[in-house]
Amino acid sequence: MFSRRIQVLSPFLKHFVNRNARMMATEANISATSANPQSQGENLKTFEIYRWNPEKPEVKPKLQKYTVDLTKCGPMVLDALIKIKNEQDPTLTFRRSCREGICGSCAMNINGSNTLACICNIKKDNKPTKIYPLPHCFIVKDLVPDLTYFYKQYKSIEPWLQNDNIPKDKEFYQSRADRAKLDGLYECILCACCSTSCPSYWWNSEEYLGPAVLMQAYRWIIDSRDQATAKRLDVMQNSMSVYRCHTIMNCARTCPKGLNPGLAIAKVKALMATA
């Protein structure tokens, strides 16, 4: 049991270690700049950020340029966004919370790829960093996408344990082998990076569940403690919910957690074929 706890806790410990390393790197960077005043102001980076305000519908969306001195900024894109909002433009709107790649709030499109701003390093080159909201979503404002329908689809798969045979000690036991089957699935943080990078989801988002939701569906389908496997598969037995996946695999390439939704979808298809 102790070894299992260590395995469960290790991802969280890893995040704290990474956070401390980033903080130390930032402090070292600022200290080096203070020790060498001539270097101040020489490491400027341009950010081109998508702006749109629903309160001003007559103004078309645009890319607005901001310049940040990287010697006085943390190493991540989110650090730059926070610095811009705090020091240059308080109207800039974006989501963020944990700053550790855990919550998924700061998902956006950076230089053409969906990712989390809090774990995306600022490129040390002369090219501007272009930042857009997640693609093919309605926009609330600036970098904030409307994920209402995404979460509605997630709710539709009933992502909770369904088992009416509650044990006397009120705990559902699971072997280590069965628990290991959930690795690579439960870590999904529902940031929507994968689904909004999928062309099939762009074209069929009203009916196709998309990579993130389907991976979560598979996570519950194979959970040895769950008794609703047949029902879960039956709900998706149509031409759209699952089979609009054409294995383009953008989902696996863009996942900031290194997961493989495409593989999970393939396994769902295999189960449906034999159900």
From Swiss-Prot:
Entry EC number(s): 1.3.5.1
Membrane topology: Peripheral membrane protein
InterPro entries: 2Fe-2S_ferredoxin-like_sf, 2Fe-2S_ferredoxin-type, 2Fe2S_fd_BS, 4Fe4S_Fe-S-bd, 4Fe4S_Fe_S_CS, Beta-grasp_dom_sf, Helical_ferredxn, SDH/FRD_Iron-Sulfur
Top-level taxon: Eukaryota
First and last residues of the transit peptide: 1-24
Keyword Ubl conjugation: no
Predominant location category: mitochondrion
SUPFAM superfamilies the record matches: 2Fe-2S ferredoxin-like, alpha-helical ferredoxin
Keyword tags: 2Fe-2S, 3Fe-4S, 4Fe-4S, Electron transport, Iron, Iron-sulfur, Membrane, Metal-binding, Mitochondrion, Mitochondrion inner membrane, Oxidoreductase, Transit peptide, Transport, Tricarboxylic acid cycle
Any one annotated GO CC term: mitochondrial inner membrane
Ligand binding ([4Fe-4S] cluster): C188, C191, C194, C255
Residues in 2Fe-2S ferredoxin-type domain copies: 57-137
Annotated positions binding a ubiquinone: W203
GO biological process per UniProt: aerobic respiration; mitochondrial electron transport, succinate to ubiquinone; respiratory electron transport chain; tricarboxylic acid cycle
Keyword Cell inner membrane: no
Location within or outside the cell: Mitochondrion inner membrane
Similarity field: Belongs to the succinate dehydrogenase/fumarate reductase iron-sulfur protein family.
Function (record text): Iron-sulfur protein (IP) subunit of succinate dehydrogenase (SDH) that is involved in complex II of the mitochondrial electron transport chain and is responsible for transferring electrons from succinate to ubiquinone (coenzyme Q).
Quaternary structure and interacting proteins, as annotated: Component of complex II composed of four subunits: a flavoprotein (FP), an iron-sulfur protein (IP), and a cytochrome b composed of a large and a small subunit.
Protein name: Succinate dehydrogenase [ubiquinone] iron-sulfur subunit, mitochondrial
Organism from which the protein derives: Schizosaccharomyces pombe (strain 972 / ATCC 24843)
The gene coding this protein: sdh2
